[in-house]
Amino acid sequence: MKSQTFFLLFLVVLLLAISQSEAFIGAVAGLLSKIFGKRSMRDMDTMKYLYDPSLSAADLKTLQKLMENY
């Protein structure tokens, strides 16, 4: 009975360690993406990179309104 209890306790501690390390790795990856600024590593606003000289301000406003709920 002692070995089963020890094994269960060991597995619970191992599961907690794995979940904590996953959160830590995710936080480090988020920090690195902010530091290096890779576009593929973070969600970028689609309107930020939209530039076409043939579009007027009214066209851009209409596009932004259409993309609000997208």
Swiss-Prot record:
Any GO BP: defense response to bacterium
Protein family (similarity comment): Belongs to the non-disulfide-bridged peptide (NDBP) superfamily. Short antimicrobial peptide (group 4) family.
Organism superkingdom: Eukaryota
Major localization listed first in the record, in broad terms: secreted
Location in or out of the cell: Secreted; Target cell membrane
GO cellular component terms attached to this protein's record: extracellular region; membrane; other organism cell membrane
Assigned keywords, A-Z: Amidation, Antibiotic, Antimicrobial, Cleavage on pair of basic residues, Membrane, Secreted, Signal, Target cell membrane, Target membrane
Protein name per the record: Peptide BmKn1
Signal peptide residue numbers: 1-23
Entry comment describing in which tissues the protein is expressed: Expressed by the venom gland.
Function statement: Antibacterial peptide.
The keyword Metal-binding belongs to this UniProt entry's keyword annotation: no
Domain note: Amphipathic and cationic peptide with an alpha-helical structure.
Positions bearing Phenylalanine amide: 36
Propiece residues: 40-70
Protein source organism: Olivierus martensii (Manchurian scorpion)
Secreted in keyword set: yes
